[in-house]
Amino acid sequence: MTQEDIKDMMLYGERINLEYKEAFNELPKSFWETYSSFANTIGGQIVLGIKEHRTKMTMQERFEIQGVNNAAKILKTLWDTVNSDKVSRNILLDENVETIDYDGKQLIVVTIPMANYTERPIY
C-alpha cells in the first residue's frame, strides 16, 4: 500500500470493511472489537494513525493524518496481544500488517482476513 492508496481511501471515509483509528501513542482498545467484527464477516482494513473529527462534514476535514508515535511499540503490542488469550484466535500473518510513510508520518495498515467458518467466532 502506498501514500496514494491512503489518499484515495480517505476520499470516501470509513466503510463496512475500512476503519481509521487514532493510535498516536498506543494501540487503541477499540482495535480488538473491529478485529473481531472484520474477522467474523468479510474481512477489512484498519488504518492506525488517522484521527476522525466527527463534527466535520467533508472527508478532507473529517480525517486527519496524525501518524503513530512509535510504530515498533504499537506493533509489539498488536502481535503480543493477538497471540495471547485476549483474542480467541490469531488469523493475521506478517504480510497482513504493514507500516506506511505518509508525508513523514508513520501509519500502520492491518488487513484482517475473513475467518474460515471453522475458526469462527473470533472474539
Give the residues covered by each predicted segment.
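Conserved N-terminal catalytic/coupling substructures associated with nucleotide/phosphate chemistry
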Residues: M1-Y123
